[in-house]
Amino acid sequence: MPFLGQDWRSPGWSWIKTEDGWKRCDPCSHEIRSEDNQYPVNHSIILNSGEEEIFNNDCEYAAKKRKKQHFGNDTAAHSFYREKWIYVHKESTKERHGYCTLGEAFNRLDFSSAIQDIRRFTYVVKLLQLIAKSQLTSLSGVAQKNYFNILDKIVQKVLDDHQNPRLIKDLLQDLSSTLCILVRGVGKSVLVGNINIWICRLETVLNWQEKLQNLQMTKQVNTGLTLSDLPLHMLNNILYRFSDGWDIVTLGQVTPTLYMLSEDRRLWKRLCQYHFAEKQFCRHLILSEKGHIEWKLMYFTLQKYYPTKEQYGDTLHFCRHCSILFWKDSGHPCTAADPDSCFTPVSPEHFIDLFKF
């Protein structure tokens, strides 16, 4: 049974119910006793009185040291698990001092395990890309270390499963550009850590880029159904579900049939209408020699000037009632009468803006 101590911020003590009433549980005392009782030895048989006193003192010191190590391991085990949400406060209060930083949120929201979820992968990569472009130097030393550890896991994941390599190449390109500017302009901005650390990071990113550049897609030996075996209307349906033009171009390079379907004007027209407004079409109208609108060229031209709509399988959410940022699947301890009405999806750009003070 947990009991709240004098300090309201403490985790409290653990109590167990016995025949004599409630007693405070000491987890390490049972472990130490069990270790001492495993090999009972009568030390008085082999030691005299003077040596026995020295032996007892050594045993007492060893027991205290073992007890201290046990408490240290227990504390580390408790701190290892953290809630996957964070309270976003922008000013000091009576209970909370300071404010929540981008680095603190980055450390607390468990992005390391989020990259293993295919629904969150694109979201996390986009967030890392935005941080690489403008917020890298605002992270604390611990957050920067966590950032590059997560990036290392992402690169290894792509090298292993061969999924989303183009997405990671774009991220590493932006990151290497930022690191080059920081290293060349040393002294112009405040860098956390020694300059040699940043040079080492740049070399690591360049090494990642080289590995991804040399990535060879292994041909899978599969006797089952393939894309070529599907009817045309199903292949067309697959293409219409893509929201990224580069994915359509890449898929069109697989077979001549898919290339023919990927060049369909109606497909690119629908993609342009999904991402861009009609006013934007008029400003960058591209016509063919026959007077038809080149929707494919229009898409890639408009992409240079305007942001495209982004779709994510799962995103972070912000609770307006509790001011808590959290993953929707993990939830958070909400006290609102109707929690769902207080939740707002947080885009990667909005996530960055939350911590601009």
Curated annotation (Swiss-Prot):
Gene3D superfamilies tied to this protein: 1.20.1280.50
Annotated F-box domain residues: 224-271
Cellular-component GO terms for this entry: cytoplasm; nucleus; SCF ubiquitin ligase complex
Keyword set, alphabetical order: Nucleus, Ubl conjugation pathway
Alphabetical list of InterPro entries matching this protein: F-box-like_dom_sf (IPR036047), FBX25/32 (IPR040394)
UniProt entry tagged with the keyword Signal: no
Protein name as it appears in the record: F-box only protein 25
Domains: entry comment: The F-box is necessary for the interaction with SKP1.
Organism of derivation: Rattus norvegicus
GO biological process: protein ubiquitination
Major localization class: nucleus
